[in-house]
Amino acid sequence: MADITEKTAEQLENLSLQDKQEGTNEENQSETVSASLYVGDLDPSVSEAHLYDIFSPIGAVSSIRVCRDAITKTSLGYAYVNFNDHDAAKTAIEKLNFTPIKGKLCRIMWSQRDPSLRKKGAGNIFIKNLHPDIDNKALYDTFSVFGNILSSKVATDETGKSKGFGYVHFEEDESASEAIDALNGMLLNGQEIYVGPHLSKKERESKFEEMKANFTNVYIKNINTETTDKEFEELVAKFGKTDSVVLERTPEGENKGFGFVNFVNHEDAVKCVEELNNTEFKGQPLYVNRAQKKYERQQELKKQYEATRMEKMAKYQGINLFIKNLDDSIDDKKLEEEFAPYGTITSAKVMTTENGKSKGFGFVCFSTPEEATKAITEKNQQIVAGKPLYVAIAQRKDVRRSQLAQQIQARNQMRFQQASAAAAAAAAAGMPGQFMPPMFYGVMPPRGVPFNGPNPQMANMGAMPKNGMPPHQFRNGPVYGVPPQGGFARNGPAANQFYQQKQRQALGEELYKRIFSRTNDEEAAGKITGMILDLPPQEVVPLLENDELFEQHFKEASAAYESFKQEQQQPQGEEAQQA
């Protein structure tokens, strides 16, 4: 097994070297037949080594590249496989297209390096009203009889469910025309499909605006359910000649309360909307407007929702308070009573589980920002039911994550500055090149785990072991970072500082154990522990006693840590893209 692994690694190394040479030879190879394949619909865990094992038996592979996100370095779900000759690549498509790779059917097609070829309308067709069971393979098999297919795909949502439409790109325009003539209006899995030329987004938008400006189809709702088809026809007949008048009904024949009218002339449709909308018919006001497609209605609803959300955010800006570390005995009524002296409360809510158990936090909304500010000043850190409250302005989740990420970055810079200052102090004391790094509580291992163990980052930093002892070579000389042998005086600032350090260390060790059990990542666990330890001790202790409160802080800190990692990788990602 070790030999196979070494062999695969060696082959991949050779491939990467060959891949670097491709850029210089690409112009010389432009006239040769393509031997490059696009492999899509891959599971995120699929690597270059995995693909090499699958494609190398077909023929000599010159290079493989799994495309990854520039920041997170996670797979984008597709890759490029380059063979030494065209015939091997063609065989790979014939034998491996739509075969499962880690549980997902891969989609293989010829790689089109020229974006103009991928985006051109010639040979590209659009198919809609597809049955949910039609997948990429079924679509390919259906249309491949008309000619060589460069690419085909059924559009899917985030869950992998078909959206009911897809695309097929033929090598020849004649193949696309034949497919449109033969399959448009035909039944596929019991559904009549539409097949037509693919239009660019600009062309579709232009056509859509033209259709809106010259609409003839009218939608009417809020119709009395006792209305007959004849009465509905008579209602709209006075506006002009119609192609169709449909009053929608259930399978049982019951009136659904809405219908559609398609006029021959656009002017008649406009007249119907203007004169019939908001008029009363059989005791009910009618809603009459241009008939819209489902996608258009969804877009409008989305815009309305966003506008309402932004308006709500602006309305509650600076007056909505977030309160945490609440005792389980505090309910909505008691929470309102606690904050009532500071102003007019419009709402007070303690968040609970499905079983009605308090989650330990809640929200109080005042009528003015001044009242909210006063409540923060008076109630923050105040003991209520034996617990110190944390009171602050409520923030959106994305804002909290951004602020936490900034805090992490600032904390790391401070630690780096502390390390530099310690190095300078050590040099001034006659120890050039040597210094005692500060204790990094944020990267403290659990008991029994060596500090310089598997984490290479901390080992390289030379961080101090958790007992604060310096390296062995200094033990016979001055010891920095630990109290003198005589110990601290029982009273005074030094004793208080020593006690706080011990308390922080104990809390850090306990937090690290819990966090490491969830992340199984030493670096992540250390950083998250350090973030939580930045809170005052009186806020950290309740986290160890309340699992739900701990889980809430852990999720927020984890999200902030991930955001920070992405920000740190940003410059590398940009350089990689430019390269």
From Swiss-Prot:
Keywords: Cytoplasm, mRNA processing, mRNA transport, Nucleus, Repeat, RNA-binding, Translation regulation, Transport. Gene3D superfamilies: 3.30.70.330, c-terminal domain of poly(a) binding protein. The keyword Nucleus applies. GO terms for molecular function: molecular condensate scaffold activity; poly(A) binding; promoter-specific chromatin binding; ribonuclease inhibitor activity. InterPro entries: Nucleotide-bd_a/b_plait_sf, PABP-dom, PABP_1234, PABP_HYD_C, PABP_RRM1, RBD_domain_sf, RRM2_I_PABPs, RRM_dom. One of its GO terms (biological process) is mRNA transport. Residues 487-566 form the PABC domain. Residues 1-10 have a biased composition (Basic and acidic residues). Its main location: cytoplasm. Residues 566-579 have a biased composition (Low complexity). It is found in: Cytoplasm; Nucleus. CDD domains: RRM1_I_PABPs (cd12378), RRM2_I_PABPs (cd12379), RRM3_I_PABPs (cd12380), RRM4_I_PABPs (cd12381). Residues 35-113, 123-200, 216-293, 319-396 form the RRM domain. GO terms for cellular component: cytoplasmic stress granule; post-mRNA release spliceosomal complex; ribosome. It comes from the Eukaryota. Signal peptide: none annotated. Residues 1-32, 560-579 are annotated as: Disordered. Binds the poly(A) tail of mRNA. Appears to be an important mediator of the multiple roles of the poly(A) tail in mRNA biogenesis, stability and translation. In the nucleus, involved in both mRNA cleavage and polyadenylation. Is also required for efficient mRNA export to the cytoplasm. Acts in concert with a poly(A)-specific nuclease (PAN) to affect poly(A) tail shortening, which may occur concomitantly with either nucleocytoplasmic mRNA transport or translational initiation. Belongs to the polyadenylate-binding protein type-1 family. This is Polyadenylate-binding protein, cytoplasmic and nuclear. It comes from Candida glabrata (strain ATCC 2001 / BCRC 20586 / JCM 3761 / NBRC 0622 / NRRL Y-65 / CBS 138).
